[in-house]
């Protein structure tokens, strides 16, 4: 298994799919990384040479991924909570933040229904 950005990349998968195992890299960014390094998207990780894997490491290191990205997201949410702005209040209450309706939907964000006590 190749190790990129502190993550063991599954070597039986194609390069594009395997790169998405890294937090912060989706399909679009994975394709861009493959184009930048000159590696075909349909080549499996185990078929890559050590220098190609090193190219992938260098390209991935240009992005904020894994622990740094998680920390950045957590700090930005914490900043909203500390400001006491509308978005921060929605985060604090566990409600949808981006204007979605809450009268009927939003079960994922609100959690399971609470029974009404009579």
Swiss-Prot record:
Protein name in the entry: Small ribosomal subunit protein uS13
The protein's assembly and partners: Part of the 30S ribosomal subunit. Forms a loose heterodimer with protein S19. Forms two bridges to the 50S subunit in the 70S ribosome.
Key words, A-Z: Ribonucleoprotein, Ribosomal protein, RNA-binding, rRNA-binding, tRNA-binding
GO cellular component: cytosol; small ribosomal subunit
Molecular-function GO terms, alphabetical: rRNA binding; structural constituent of ribosome; tRNA binding
Name of the gene this protein is made from: rpsM
Gene Ontology terms: biological process: translation
Similarity-based family: Belongs to the universal ribosomal protein uS13 family.
Functional summary from the UniProt entry: Located at the top of the head of the 30S subunit, it contacts several helices of the 16S rRNA. In the 70S ribosome it contacts the 23S rRNA (bridge B1a) and protein L5 of the 50S subunit (bridge B1b), connecting the 2 subunits; these bridges are implicated in subunit movement. Contacts the tRNAs in the A and P-sites.
Organism per entry: Haemophilus ducreyi (strain 35000HP / ATCC 700724)
SUPFAM superfamilies: S13-like H2TH domain (SSF46946)
Keyword Magnesium belongs to the record: no
Span list, region Disordered: 94-118
Source organism, top-level taxon: Bacteria
